[in-house]
Amino acid sequence: MSEKIRMLPAVEARALDGTEYRLPSDLGGERNLIAVAFERNHQDDVDTWLGDFAALEDEHTGLMTYEMPTISRRFSPVRGVLDGKMADAIPDPKTRARTITAYTDVGRIRDSLGLPDTKQIAVIVCDRDGVVSWLALGERSDEAAADLRAALNG
């Protein structure tokens, strides 16, 4: 029996700088390294990966890095307020441009990525078709970072 292919499904999203995206096709890299967060308290776990994200993007031509807060579509009416608060907390324009919020069916994202739940962040590498070639859950560990580096080098 073959393993289920993990996918980043098609979703409308917007970066904190206002750029509209149709994911995954509008992602900027041949390969895209994305920290997918599901809860506000996940930002600390995302932050543990950001040093690796910056270094790997410098080392790998065609790799782009993103943060993707994934929020239930029921919060769409207050998107401006929520995105505004996130943008205010991020002084760096490059980081705002790479933080893409998706107000969507969170369960659909979870299921397409093959996640058991949304209690942890998912760090993924995917192409512009959404095919996930690497995935780790939770905060950075040395083992997960080494595995990511090997996947990108392989």
Regions found by a protein language model. Name each.
Residues 39, 71, 137-141:
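Short beta->alpha junction loops/turns
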Residues 111, 118-154:
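Thiol-/selenol-based redox modules, centered on thioredoxin-like
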Residues 1-24, 48, 96-98:
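N-terminal "domain-start" segment that seeds a small globular fold
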Residues 66-68, 81-117:
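Short, internal strand/loop/helix patches
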Residues 25-47:
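Short active-site neighborhood of thiol/selenol oxidoreductases, capturing the structured segment around
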Residues 8, 28-31, 62, 120:
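A structure-centric signal for secondary-structure junctions around beta-strands
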Residues 42-91:
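Structural microenvironment flanking redox-active thiols in thiol-disulfide oxidoreductases
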